[in-house]
A protein has these predicted regions:
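Extended, charged alpha/beta regions that create polyanion-binding interfaces
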Residues: 2-3, 13-20, 25-28, 90, ...
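Solvent-exposed alpha-helices and their adjacent loops that cap or buttress functional pockets
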Residues: 15, 57-63, 70, 99-100
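An N-cap/entry alpha-helix motif that binds or orients negatively charged groups
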Residues: 17-59
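Gly-rich Lys/Arg/Thr-decorated short loops/hinges at beta-loop-alpha junctions or inter-strand turns
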Residues: 30-31, 71-80, 98-108
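A common structural microfeature
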Residues: 32, 44-47, 64-67, 73, ...
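Short, glycine/charged-enriched hinge/interface segments at domain edges or termini
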Residues: 51-66, 79, 92
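Glycine- and acidic-residue-enriched helix-capping/strand-helix junction motifs
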Residues: 77-91
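Conserved small/polar residues in nucleotide/adenosyl-binding loops
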Residues: 112-114
């Protein structure tokens, strides 16, 4: 990659907002009622329904359309052992591909060894 394309890549990953993926609400949050339904006390109702019938988790949550992309950064896409923080752009890129090609939501996790 030439210097011009390297610079373009850095700008792409940092502007206007750093990263390539985000968590966005799927429900309204414009009122106190919306927030009460989204969290407490309203969230208890679907929790109880899931407790009664475990498969309800797919009815009331995003579980059926959510994956985790996890790396500790030790074997990254031809880059080798670059560490968890340096692997984050690759994990976000995988998340972006899942979203645009399959409409699957992703949480990317970069794990640090302790």
């Amino acid at each position: 990659m030439n210097k011009k394309e390297e610079r373009a890549s850095l700008i792409y990953h940092s502007k206007p907002k750093p990263g390539k993926i985000a968590v966005v609400p799927t429900k309204s949050y414009n009122s106190q009622r919306d927030l009460a339904l989204a969290y407490s006390p309203g969230v208890a109702v679907p929790c109880k329904e899931i407790e009664k019938e475990e498969n309800n988790v797919y009815k009331y949550t995003n579980k059926g359309n959510l994956v985790a992309v996890i790396s500790n950064g030790t074997a990254v896409l031809g880059l080798g052992d670059i560490g968890p923080n340096a692997s984050k752009p690759v994990m976000e890129g995988k998340g972006l591909l899942f979203k645009i090609f399959a409409d699957i939501d992703v949480f990317d996790l970069s794990l640090i060894h302790i």
